[in-house]
């Protein structure tokens, strides 16, 4: 893995521990929530964005977003498991999660998204963390950013996650967390959920660090 990917990975893993700790310590009914997370009653659903034919964004040096999302997510799962958290992966290989006869890429993407939503919503006591990489037509943008669902607890969790990413990865990052408007997965889930854009694949300087 390239150095920049390792840097993003370590920052994301550290942030995961921090935001879950913050969620447990400072949210209402803190002792109950933290006990549920560490005891395994709460399930952290980890969603590596894209997969299979849908590679997501492609970095300036050819890095596929889907593969990087999966690598980060698998390591995040391992870290959270070591911390006593119960996890569930949306996917564990570089494959999409569509089902049924899908004749086109568009149909596969629709099926894939619906299956992700169903998996999250059928998981009792779920807390969703969706992992993605950002991309923009201009290469000057950088930094991680957290987006949140409209469900209870999501905005507060996103704020703490954004701060944790800033502390662990990029002290100069001044990006603010935002509502994930028009993101199908985040609009359809019923549980607390955030989407983490770990960095910009379109930023060559960030990639080379």
What would you call each of these model-derived segments?
Residues 1-209:
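Catalytic-site microenvironment of enzymes
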């Amino acid at each position: 893995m390239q150095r920049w990917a390792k840097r993003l990975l370590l920052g994301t893993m550290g942030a995961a521990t921090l935001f879950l700790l913050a969620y447990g310590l400072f949210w209402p009914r803190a002792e109950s929530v933290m006990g549920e997370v560490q005891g395994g009653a709460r399930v952290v659903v980890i969603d590596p964005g894209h997969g299979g034919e849908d590679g997501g964004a492609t970095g300036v040096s050819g890095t596929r977003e889907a593969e990087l999302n999966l690598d980060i997510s698998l390591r995040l799962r391992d870290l959270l498991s070591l911390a006593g958290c119960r996890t569930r992966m949306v996917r564990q290989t570089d494959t999409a999660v569509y089902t049924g006869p899908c004749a086109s890429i568009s149909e596969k993407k629709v099926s894939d998204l619906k299956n992700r939503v169903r998996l999250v919503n059928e998981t009792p006591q779920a807390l969703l963390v969706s992992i993605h990489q950002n991309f923009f037509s201009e290469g000057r943008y950088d930094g991680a950013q957290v987006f949140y669902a409209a469900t209870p607890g999501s905005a507060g969790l996103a704020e703490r996650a954004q701060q944790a990413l800033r502390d662990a990865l990029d002290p100069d990052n001044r990006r603010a967390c935002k509502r994930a408007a028009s993101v199908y997965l985040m609009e359809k889930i019923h549980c607390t959920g955030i989407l983490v854009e770990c960095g910009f694949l379109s930023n060559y300087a960030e990639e080379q660090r």
